[in-house]
């Protein structure tokens, strides 16, 4: 009798994706983040579903419904903080996952990479809309400022903003539609994740050397299932420490004040995971220029495969490129810090220098350094 694992149409797909999948024998813990992102997505959908059972998307009651969840619903506070801090863990894993892709040249799998960039945009959109839902001060003003950026688009800008708002300001219609989209998008993301995996399994995983590992493959289970479980335990531990000891560490105190259109908070800023892009946006004095730079800061990932000039795929054996990569990492930390600071000297100039450095490392310095390394190796 044939094994059900290999004969049943549905189980066969799972088998070929997670059990008998041939994987390179040398992939490091940097390859754990894909599975962690899957767990994060499942956790967010699950906690979000239970939160949605008690949440009301009406401007009059939204803030109170979140308070009600935290105070009156059984373990509602756990659900709420798991969801809020789960988003932070999601973005930590996302940025590490993208960083791994950049370092080891995984972007050479073009289809997988481009679907990944679209996924990044979708997750960012979902997180932004989710931040609006508690209807605190930062929710309201964050929504106002970020959606208002679209008015910089020539000719159709103002109409587009009013269309998204459903009126002449961020109000009840905006909150209702943001809730609808925030609920819907994670399921679209889940479907796109399957496409992401489909493309990945067409080529197989990359590995730290960047050299094809076809001669030395091992089954995904038990080797990498065990390895992934270790990563999962570490992530869940970090998340639970965050939720149970300092749930508001990454949040903004202003969001505990109900939304008030007549009172602007002194410093409007998004959640920490958007601060680097926000800093790039603010570093350009022109509105349209800022919006373009904001979009380009993420969209630039799409052209990274086209800028690959090295004869080697991975950075493992390229010390000069490694230096640039870590400079880029430090630059992103700097931008994140600047995004949370007020718009005054010296933060403005630091933000502008960091923004120029960010773009020039990716567009100019990386390709030139790769060419220099090729030349040094006489390739």
From Swiss-Prot:
Summary of subunit composition and partner proteins: The cytochrome bc1 complex contains 11 subunits: 3 respiratory subunits (MT-CYB, CYC1 and UQCRFS1), 2 core proteins (UQCRC1 and UQCRC2) and 6 low-molecular weight proteins (UQCRH/QCR6, UQCRB/QCR7, UQCRQ/QCR8, UQCR10/QCR9, UQCR11/QCR10 and a cleavage product of UQCRFS1). This cytochrome bc1 complex then forms a dimer.
Subcellular location per the Swiss-Prot or TrEMBL entry: Mitochondrion inner membrane
UniProt GO BP: mitochondrial electron transport, ubiquinol to cytochrome c
PANTHER family attached to this UniProt entry: CYTOCHROME B
Cofactor binding, per record: Binds 2 heme b groups non-covalently.
Database matches in CDD domains: cytochrome_b_C, Cytochrome_b_N
Binding site for heme b b566: 97, 196
Family assignment from sequence similarity: Belongs to the cytochrome b family.
Protein name, entry field: Cytochrome b
Disulfide bond among keywords: no
One term under GO cellular component: respiratory chain complex III
Binding site for heme b b562: 83, 182
GO molecular function: metal ion binding; ubiquinol-cytochrome-c reductase activity
Further information: Heme 1 (or BL or b562) is low-potential and absorbs at about 562 nm, and heme 2 (or BH or b566) is high-potential and absorbs at about 566 nm.
């Amino acid at each position: 009798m044939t094994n059900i694992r290999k004969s049943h149409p549905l189980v066969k797909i799972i088998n070929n994706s997670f059990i008998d999948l041939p994987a390179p024998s040398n992939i490091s813990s940097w390859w754990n983040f894909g599975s962690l992102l899957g767990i994060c997505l499942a956790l967010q959908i699950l906690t979000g579903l239970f939160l949605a059972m008690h949440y009301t998307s009406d401007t009059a009651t939204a803030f109170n419904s979140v308070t009600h969840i935290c105070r009156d619903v059984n373990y509602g506070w756990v659900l709420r903080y798991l969801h809020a801090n789960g988003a932070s863990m999601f973005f930590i894993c996302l940025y590490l996952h993208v960083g791994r892709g950049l370092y080891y040249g995984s972007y050479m799998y073009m289809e997988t990479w481009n679907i990944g960039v679209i996924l990044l945009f979708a997750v960012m959109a979902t997180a932004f809309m989710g931040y609006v839902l508690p209807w605190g001060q930062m929710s309201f003003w964050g929504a106002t400022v970020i959606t208002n950026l679209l008015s910089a688009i020539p000719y159709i800008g103002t109409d587009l903003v009013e269309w998204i708002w459903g009126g002449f300001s961020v109000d009840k219609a905006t909150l209702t539609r943001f809730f609808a989209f925030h609920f819907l998008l994670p399921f679209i993301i889940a479907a796109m994740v399957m496409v992401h995996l489909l493309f990945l399994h067409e080529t197989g995983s990359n590995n730290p050397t960047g050299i094809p590992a076809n001669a030395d493959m091992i089954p995904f289970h038990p080797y990498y299932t065990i390895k992934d479980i270790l990563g999962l335990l570490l992530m869940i531990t970090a998340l639970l420490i965050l939720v149970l000891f300092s749930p508001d560490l990454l949040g903004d105190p202003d969001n505990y004040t109900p939304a008030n259109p007549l009172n602007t908070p002194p410093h409007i800023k998004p959640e920490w995971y958007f601060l680097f892009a926000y800093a790039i946006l603010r570093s350009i004095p022109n509105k349209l220029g800022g919006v373009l730079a904001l979009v380009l800061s993420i969209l630039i990932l799409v052209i990274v495969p086209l800028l690959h000039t090295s004869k080697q795929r991975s950075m493992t054996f390229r010390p000069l490129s490694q230096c640039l990569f870590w400079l880029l990492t430090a630059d992103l930390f700097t931008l994140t810090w600047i995004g949370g600071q007020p718009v005054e000297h010296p933060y403005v100039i630091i933000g502008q220098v960091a923004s120029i450095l960010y773009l020039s490392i990716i567009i100019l310095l990386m390709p030139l350094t790769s060419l220099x390394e090729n030349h040094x190796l006489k390739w």
